[in-house]
């Protein structure tokens, strides 16, 4: 079936699921190699794992800009295709490529010029600073891979081809996972590079994944092509991309700020607490990847059918989305409730970390249902062209409510009960996101 016909005619439930499953698998694999990185780094030392956790806040900011730009581009391309304007879609895709390349250049310069200063801002400990600098500089200087890989995947997703999007990510992930132990520990004649080796393995995997995604677009994407000949830059395309993309960038960047701030709060408790939060965050991201895959799939479905004025299909997508997400949330909660010690054990957790980490994982897991609803509401609203719902929901759950509550509870009730701050933030964010998305659906689904 032609990609455009599939988005317009295929029954919504199977359409959403067939698009979502490859995305879920690709995101799970992407998250898995982040976890594999941490598992190998943890075998170096808990200090190395703490350094990787501190740097993750900066990596997350970089990913935020790339993903946000790609989400905005994806939504715009889907609407243009739904409006039967393929030439405008191709022009927007070319503009998106220039935006990604420009952003990559900025982060490369930051890595070359400011890695020492960033490491100093993350921690006062000299050993941690050195490890942070080694890990961060490689990821920043060679960031081209993650931006171009994200770009290529979103072009494929915009026409409904989530399978090739998944394959490109799998290629990069497999390369990364194979290279990790070789470069970290010095296997097969490669010098042992420690935490720097983990970073090098990551960027090589990203660059190869990017090459695969761009190649698939060149030979397999039947609709969207980058065209430099007769290309005319239009600020309106940039505005349309960032109307949805900027709130998503802010939303993702909020996660970076949250990670940085929580690490700062937890450093006052112990370095083990920082290492634990880094582990939790990656485990939670792994379990949430099916939800993000479902959310990414709904953007082109909603965007295309909203653009083609098929409001009944937009409403059907909403009716399928949340119940499916709830199932994933309950499964994730069950895993965290039943196997917290085993999950932490994957990362060579110390006795100190296990003492507060096991109850912490159980406390936080209860909030997954509310988090899933908030996340999916944000994706759905983005498909309708409104990225603000996503941004405000993220701000409430990760910044505005969470940080002051966590800071207060640590000082008044100690580390063991501080994790109840997640309950407060997730419930408030969920209530807002449901209200705002239903309002958007009423206004645009008429």
What are these regions (language model features)?
Residues 28, 32-50, 119-126, 182-193, ...:
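Helix-terminus/linker motif at the lipid-water interface of multi-pass membrane proteins
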Residues 49-109, 146-165, 276-338, 371-393:
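Small-residue-rich hydrophobic transmembrane alpha-helices
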Residues 61-64, 176-181, 210-214, 286-289, ...:
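Hydrophobic transmembrane alpha-helices of multi-pass small-molecule transporters
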Residues 70, 138-157, 165-173, 198-213, ...:
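Short runs within selected transmembrane alpha-helices of multi-pass transporters and secretion channels
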Residues 18, 41-60, 126-131, 195-196, ...:
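Interfacial/gating helices of multi-pass transporter permease domains
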Residues 13-32, 36, 58-65, 141, ...:
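Residue-level signal for short hydrophobic patches within transmembrane helices
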Residues 18-37, 138, 149, 172, ...:
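Transmembrane helical elements of multi-pass membrane transporters/channels
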Residues 1-20, 77-144, 190-246, 302-367, ...:
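Short alpha-helical transmembrane segments in multi-pass integral membrane proteins
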């Amino acid at each position: 079936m032609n990609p455009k016909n599939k988005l317009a005619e295929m029954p919504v439930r199977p359409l959403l699921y067939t698009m979502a499953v490859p995305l879920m698998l690709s995101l799970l694999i992407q998250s898995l190699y982040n976890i594999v990185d941490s598992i190998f780094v943890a075998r170096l030392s808990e200090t190395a794992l703490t350094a990787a956790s501190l740097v993750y806040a900066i990596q997350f900011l970089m990913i935020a800009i790339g993903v946000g730009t790609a989400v905005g581009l994806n939504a715009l391309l889907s609407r243009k295709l739904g409006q039967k304007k393929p030439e405008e879609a191709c022009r927007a895709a070319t503009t998106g490529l220039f935006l990604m390349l420009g952003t990559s250049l900025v982060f490369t310069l930051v890595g070359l010029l400011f890695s020492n200063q960033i490491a100093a801002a993350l921690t006062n400990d000299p050993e941690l600073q050195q490890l942070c600098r080694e890990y961060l500089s490689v990821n920043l200087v060679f960031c081209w891979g993650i931006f171009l890989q994200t770009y290529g995947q979103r072009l494929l997703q915009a026409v409904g081809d989530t399978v090739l999007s998944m394959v490109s990510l799998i290629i990069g992930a497999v390369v990364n996972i194979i290279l990790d132990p070789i470069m970290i520990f010095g296997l097969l004649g490669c010098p042992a590079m420690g935490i720097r080796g983990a970073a090098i393995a990551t960027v090589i995997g990203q660059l190869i994944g990017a090459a695969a995604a761009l190649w698939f677009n060149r030979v397999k994407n039947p609709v969207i092509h980058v065209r430099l000949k007769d290309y005319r830059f239009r600020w309106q395309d940039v505005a349309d991309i960032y109307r949805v993309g900027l709130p998503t960038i802010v939303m993702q960047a909020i996660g970076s700020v949250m990670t940085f701030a929580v690490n700062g709060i937890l450093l006052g408790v112990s370095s083990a607490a920082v290492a634990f939060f880094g582990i939790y965050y990656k485990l939670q991201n792994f379990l949430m990847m099916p939800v993000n895959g479902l959310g990414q799939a709904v953007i082109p479905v909603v965007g295309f059918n909203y653009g083609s004025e098929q409001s009944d299909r937009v409403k059907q997508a909403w009716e399928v989305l949340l119940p499916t997400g709830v199932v994933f949330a309950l499964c994730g909660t069950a895993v965290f409730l039943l196997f917290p010690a085993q999950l932490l054990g994957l990362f060579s957790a110390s006795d100190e970390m296990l003492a507060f980490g096991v109850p912490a994982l159980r406390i936080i897991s209860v909030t997954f249902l509310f988090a899933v609803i908030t996340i999916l509401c944000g994706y759905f609203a983005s498909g309708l062209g409104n990225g603000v719902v996503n941004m405000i929901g993220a701000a409430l759950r990760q910044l505005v409510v969470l940080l002051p509550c966590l800071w207060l509870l640590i000082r008044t009730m100690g580390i063991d009960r501080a994790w109840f701050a997640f309950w407060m933030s997730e419930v408030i964010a969920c209530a807002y996101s449901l209200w705002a998305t239903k309002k958007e659906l009423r206004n645009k689904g008429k």
